[in-house]
Amino acid sequence: MRNLSTEFKEQQNSGNRNYLKYADFTFTDGSTLSITDKDLWSNGFNFEDAVSQSGSFDIGAAIVNKLTLQINNFSGKYTDYIWDGARVVCYIGLELSTGIEKIRICTMTVTDAPYQSTAIISLTCEDSMRLFDRDYSESKLTYPATRLQIIQDACEVCGVTLQSTRFDNDDFVIQNRPNDNSITFRQVIAWVAQMGCQWAKSDEYGRLCLGWYERE
């Protein structure tokens, strides 16, 4: 859950959607770039944060969420950047009485950046859930194994930090290893989450979380 100030929540509840947008890039060569609203086209910042497929209510979803950016390249100053593989951390902000409050919303990797020398650079970015799209045959975990051990193993093999170091019924033991001839780590994660009536998602820092909807 993201930490928001009381005033930020009040502004949202009153209908204020005048969000300021920020994206900080780290390129594969180690160089960095920060862009803000003035560098983006209108409606050029779209972020998915789903834990269920569109039009359905899923238990055990493990969705790769996406971010699309459309950068204003009218001056040509961004033409020579190598966007593919860049890490991007995005924030939104609101003008409050105490100044601008920025909230981190995602950590993504640019996965599609067709070369464009035009006025618009369109980037498609995906979160760390995509890293689990590897054959489960790579896992050397011995079964029986607990739900927590299966999730820990998936994170270790795929190079993703686990945020949910404990979760409901994480000690439930699964006796038999799934047939790994044609399944991925992400499918196994979804299966483990479904067994606990939970979802799995990548948080704003790119860590794997297992949880469920908050009840107020």
Per-region residue spans from a language model:
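Assembly/oligomerization scaffold segments
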Residues: 1-144, 153, 157, 177-197, ...
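Short acidic/His/Gly/Ser-rich catalytic and metal-binding motifs that mark active-site loops
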Residues: 131-135, 162-167
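Acidic carboxylate-rich catalytic motifs and surrounding loops in phosphoryl-/glycosyl-chemistry enzymes
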Residues: 166-169, 203-206
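Surface-exposed aromatic
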Residues: 168-179
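Acidic/histidine-enriched alpha-helical segments
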Residues: 205-215
